[in-house]
Each structure stands twice: as structure tokens, then as C-alpha cells.
């Protein structure tokens, strides 16, 4: 493929080849009772992840060059193969395949959303930050709900609600702190309004998702109830304090003309007055 296909079409072609190969293997494995062939089907998402890393760049568009069709085909084959081969695969391999597939699906969708949000701006502003976090945060919100979801979540609740969600929760918490500190909150063409702007609404959405998942997920990981309560409340409190502090600085930047640089913000009387009021509350 790398030799005969032009570079812009290589990733889509590789994904289709992988999907077709695994579909054939998943079809033959139960008929031939070939356990090793069934196990090879679990390599679909890791190999697709390698293709994604090979194709990725700052303006990567997963849906380009019929990528939308290639990725849709790959994920359809992935879930079909796992359902067809469930009785033939070792429990550990089956569990890992579900978790890796979940991460890959969210990653591809997040990259596509990020690309679409890039069209809203020319600078690295709040829209680009939101592209990374909205879908993983929405997933955490959904997994925190007590309702029963259809297959595969219903059949493998620990894989989707706990094993796949725990690293995402840590990732979203890290994203919260990084975006809160680094981003000045520009979201052209929208004007900046404290707490009512895309960045800070997105930060609250991500933090709420982490908190909602942690209330149930930490117990599934074996964390004691009292310790879990202290941990979630402590992290949420510290994060909200950091958000309000940065909100004051962003407000001074947009409304008071203070450069969004640490030295300038700390030296600003406007920032100091705003922090005094917010911290007193």
C-alpha cells in the first residue's frame, strides 16, 4: 500500500485493508475453530492506532479522502468481530480489545471535531482547546449514568464504565488544568463573558464529567467511600478555585487590556482587586 498508493490516500487505504483482513479472519475463525486466528482479530485497533499516528499532523482531518468511510468500516468490523468471537477469545484479550477500541473511537471523533472547530478560528484559541475534550467528557457523563446501555456496554460494563473511563477522567482533569492556565479564552466571533464563554463552559463541562464519573468509578476501582468522597471534593474544590482565579485574569485581559502574561497579570492592580473580591467570596 505504501508503495503503490499516493500519500494522501494511504491511511484510508490501509484502514480498509485492515478492516477487510480482520473481517475475513473473524468469519473463518469460528468455522475452522482456529483460536490463533481469532486472537489476531484483536490486533485491529492497535494497528489502526499505528495508522492514525502515521497520518496525524496538526491539521489532520480523519474524514478526508473517504476517511469517514474507512473509519466507519473499521469500527463496524471491530465490534462485529468482537461479538462474533466472544466465546472463542481469552477473557483478557477480549477485555483489552474493547477498551482499546473505545479509546480509538473517541480519539478519532475528537480529532474530527477538533478539525471542524479549527474552521472557526485562525489562532490557537478556545475553539481548538474544546475540540480535544467535548467528546471524551460527554462519554464520561454517559458512563456515569446508572441506566443500562445497549451492547457492548451492557455486556462489558467494567471495560467501558471503569477501565476505559478511568484514564479518560485523568486525561480530562489534566486538560482542564492545562487549558485553564494556558488559554486566554478568545473565541471569535463571540465576545468574552466571564463563565459564559466557550472555554469556561467547556471547562465546567469537563470538570463536571470527571466529578460525576468519579463518584461511581472510584468505588469500582476499590477506593473506600470516605476516601473517595474526600478526594473528589478536594479535586473539584481546587479546580473550581483555579477556574475562578483564571477567570478574573481572563476578564482583566479582555475587558481591561492587560496582556495575558503571568508577570503582567500579577502586576495589574485590576487583577489584584478582582482576585481580592473573588477570593473573599
Give the role of each language-model region.
Residues 1-281:
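Alpha-helical transmembrane segments of multi-pass membrane proteins
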Amino acid at each position: 500500500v505504501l508503495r503503490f498508493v499516493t500519500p494522501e490516500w494511504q491511511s484510508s487505504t490501509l484502514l480498509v485493508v485492515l478492516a477487510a483482513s480482520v473481517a475475513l479472519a473473524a468469519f473463518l475463525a469460528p468455522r475452522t475453530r482456529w483460536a490463533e486466528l481469532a486472537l489476531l482479530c484483536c490486533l485491529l485497533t492497535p494497528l489502526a492506532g499505528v495508522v492514525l499516528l502515521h497520518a496525524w499532523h496538526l491539521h489532520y482531518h480523519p474524514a478526508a479522502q473517504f476517511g469517514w468511510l474507512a473509519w466507519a468500516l473499521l469500527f463496524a468490523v471491530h465490534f462485529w468481530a468482537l461479538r462474533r468471537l466472544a466465546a472463542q477469545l481469552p477473557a483478557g484479550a477480549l477485555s483489552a480489545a474493547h477498551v482499546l477500541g473505545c479509546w480509538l473511537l473517541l480519539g478519532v471523533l475528537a480529532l474530527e471535531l477538533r478539525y471542524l472547530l479549527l474552521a472557526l478560528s485562525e489562532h490557537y484559541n478556545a475553539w481548538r482547546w474544546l475540540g480535544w475534550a467535548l467528546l471524551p467528557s460527554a462519554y464520561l457523563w454517559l458512563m456515569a449514568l446508572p441506566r443500562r446501555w445497549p451492547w457492548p456496554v451492557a455486556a462489558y460494563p467494567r471495560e467501558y464504565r471503569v477501565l476505559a473511563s478511568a484514564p479518560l477522567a485523568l486525561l480530562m482533569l489534566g486538560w482542564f488544568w492545562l487549558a485553564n492556565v494556558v488559554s486566554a479564552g478568545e473565541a471569535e466571533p463571540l465576545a468574552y463573558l466571564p463563565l459564559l464563554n466557550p472555554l469556561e463552559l467547556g471547562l465546567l463541562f469537563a470538570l463536571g464529567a470527571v466529578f460525576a464519573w468519579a463518584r461511581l468509578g472510584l468505588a469500582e476501582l476499590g477506593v473506600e467511600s470516605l476516601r473517595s468522597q474526600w478526594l473528589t471534593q478536594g479535586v473539584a474544590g481546587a479546580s473550581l478555585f483555579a477556574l475562578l482565579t483564571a477567570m478574573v485574569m481572563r476578564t482583566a485581559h479582555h475587558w481591561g487590556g492587560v496582556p495575558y502574561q503571568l508577570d503582567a497579570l500579577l502586576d495589574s492592580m485590576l487583577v489584584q482587586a478582582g482576585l481580592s473580591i473573588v477570593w473573599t467570596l
